[in-house]
C-alpha cells in the first residue's frame, strides 16, 4: 500500500515537473523572440524626442553643437544597425539594389550637409546646421531601411502620417530642387538677358551628360554635374579651372526673387544677379 502511495506521489511530481518545464520553456521562447522593428524604431523615436524637448534656450553654441551631434549619432547608430541586419538577411540581388540606393543616398546627404553648413558663412553655427541636416536625413533613411527589414521578416511596419511628412521634407531630391528654379528669369529687360534653369534635353545650351543646365545670357553655363551642395532652398555649384575654383549659388532671396551669385570662394560670392 505504501508502495502504491509513493508511486502515485512520484507520478504527480513528474507531471508537475513536466508542466513547469513546459511553462518555463514557453516563457523563455517568448523572451527570446526578437523585438519587432516597429517597437525598435518607436524606442529610438522616444530617445529622439528627449533631444527635441531639451532646454535649448539655456545652451550656448558649443553645447548646442555637441547636443545636435549626439542627436545625429543616435539615428546614425540605428541606421548602421539596420543596414548590418539587412546585409545578412536580404537575398543577393535585392542587397545589391539596396546597396546602390544607399550609396546614392550617402552622396545626396553629403551635399545636403555641405549646403546647410554654408549658410553659416563659416561661423560657429555651422556645426549645428550640419548636424541638424545630417540627423533629419538619417532619420528619414532609417525609416526606409526599417521598412525593408520589416518586409523581409514579414512584419507589419507603419509610418505615422506626421512622421512621413517630416521624412518627405528632410530628403528632397536634387531634381525636386531644380524644379523650383525651372524657367528663364529676366534680369535685364533691355537686352532680354536672363538666367535660364532648364532640363538639358530641352535646353539649347544643354550640357552633355547632365539632367539640368543653368545658363546666363552672355555668361557661364553650368549643370547639375557641377553641384557642390544643396538644401531645399538653394543649390551651390563648383567649377574647377586650371588656376582657380569658381562657385555659384542659385536661390530665392528674402524678396522671393531669383538670385544667382558668383565668386572664387564660398565666402565671397559677391557678383550677384537678381532677376525680376
What residue spans do the PLM features occupy?
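Short beta-strand segments that buttress and anchor functional surface loops
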Residues: 186-187, 213-216, 235-242, 260-263
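Short, exposed beta-strand-loop hairpins at the edges of beta-sheets
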Residues: 248-269
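Short, surface-exposed coil-to-beta transition loops
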Residues: 113, 128-129, 191-192, 198, ...
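N-terminal glycine/threonine-rich, aromatic-flanked beta-hairpin/loop signature
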Residues: 83, 191-232
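N-terminal alpha-helical modules
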Residues: 27-172
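N-terminal helix-cap/turn-to-beta initiation motif at the start of protein domains
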Residues: 168-184, 201
